[in-house]
Amino acid sequence: DFFITATERQRSIMLDQFNKYTPFTPHIVTIPVGSVDKLRKPEGERKPFSIITASRLANEKHVDWLAKAVVKAKESLPQVNFDIYGTGAEETKLKAIIEENQAQDYIHLKGHQDLTEVYKDYELYLSGSKSEGFGLTLLEAVGSGLGMIGFDVRYGNQTFIKDNENGYLIPRFEKDDEPAIVAALAEKIV
């Protein structure tokens, strides 16, 4: 018998918990929930100042924070362009944010698509989730060589984003202080 985890960090925490609370040391195997078949690089130049996110458009994914951060980043980086891939219940809210900020020229809702060959054309991937077990989109983005920005939360982001190496991990906020969160994201985008 054995346990399966999606990341080494989950495995380590599970072992620590068993060692702390039981005399039993289980056999734990890490099997990632996904993989990329090959690394993908752009055939030419990546689109300059291009940002992508891919997610269910759900409240817990906080894509609204990402859109607001791009609006704020545009004040310092007028060339920025943000494409949001995915569908879901928050789509109407995102459309309203885009319209309220007159951002139709640089923030685009792209719907659900096969992104296998899409990531490689962008420069930066944004993640707004504060709880990502593994994050297949993170794996796909890193497999295409994108810089990445996400929150410093266990598992997915900490697995794929190496702070100040291939991107930035935004420190966790105790409360959902939206203005501070949006400002922190915008600062790293710029």
Regions found by a protein language model. Give the residues of each.
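C-terminal "capping" alpha-helix adjacent to the active site of nucleotide-linked donor transferases
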Residues: R172-V190
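Aromatic "clamp/platform" in nucleotide-sugar-dependent glycosyltransferases that forms part
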Residues: K130
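Conserved donor-binding/catalytic core segment of Leloir-type glycosyltransferases
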Residues: I4, E43-K61, A67-V70
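Short acidic/histidine- and often glycine-rich active-site loop of Leloir-type glycosyltransferases
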Residues: V153-R172
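Nucleotide-activated donor-binding/catalytic signature segment of Leloir-type glycosyltransferases, i.e.
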Residues: K93-H112
